[in-house]
């Protein structure tokens, strides 16, 4: 494995060239703009190419994965986890929708795919989607999801939020947080 930085920028759309936050830091830059079949959905050929380009980068660290169109990248990174873990996700969406095109990996269904396919993923802590979105999640997945809705967050006081974090996140052995600089919904 080549020498790596703990910050990885995955460049799908070119947006990071316009950003400043990384320019005075040591980062690992993975160029992915030329990979076809990646926008919102990721087909098998694209998965193979992405895995090839990322294979020498560590799973640990901070991975900036471009916009929400590429959230499924977390699913690809998680395949490398060789010990049991739980996943912490802050998002406005559940990302547990059934795939619109067969079994193709998507930005809207990657959490469901991870829960169904990854043996080491024990459960997901999902913070942020609204109650209506969570009601649409497949019942078979809900037993492995700890959910905190946007509505509940708005009415919780500091003590309740701290309790939730102590009781759930304290058990997280590995957590991944989605950082979305350009997505507002």
Question: Which positions does each model-derived feature cover?
Answer:
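Conserved small/polar residues in nucleotide/adenosyl-binding loops
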Residues: 177-184
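Active-site glycine-rich loop that binds ribose-phosphate moieties when present
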Residues: 103-116, 131-133, 147-170
């Amino acid at each position: 494995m080549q020498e790596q930085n703990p910050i990885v920028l995955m460049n799908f759309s070119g947006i990071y060239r316009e950003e400043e936050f990384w320019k005075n830091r040591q980062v690992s830059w993975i160029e992915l703009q030329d990979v076809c079949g990646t926008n919102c959905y990721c087909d098998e050929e694209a998965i193979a190419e992405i895995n090839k380009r990322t294979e020498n980068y560590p799973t640990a660290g901070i991975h900036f994965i471009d916009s929400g169109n590429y959230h499924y990248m977390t699913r690809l990174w998680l395949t490398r986890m060789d010990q049991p873990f739980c996943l912490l996700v802050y998002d406005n969406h559940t990302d547990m929708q059934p795939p619109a095109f067969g079994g193709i990996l998507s930005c809207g269904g990657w959490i469901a795919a991870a829960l169904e396919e990854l043996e080491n993923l024990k459960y997901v802590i999902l913070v942020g989607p609204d109650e209506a979105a969570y009601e649409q999640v497949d019942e078979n997945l809900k037993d492995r999801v700890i959910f905190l809705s946007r509505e509940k967050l708005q009415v919780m006081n500091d003590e309740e939020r701290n309790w939730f974090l102590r009781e759930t996140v304290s058990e997280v052995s590995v957590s991944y947080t989605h950082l979305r600089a350009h997505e507002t919904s």
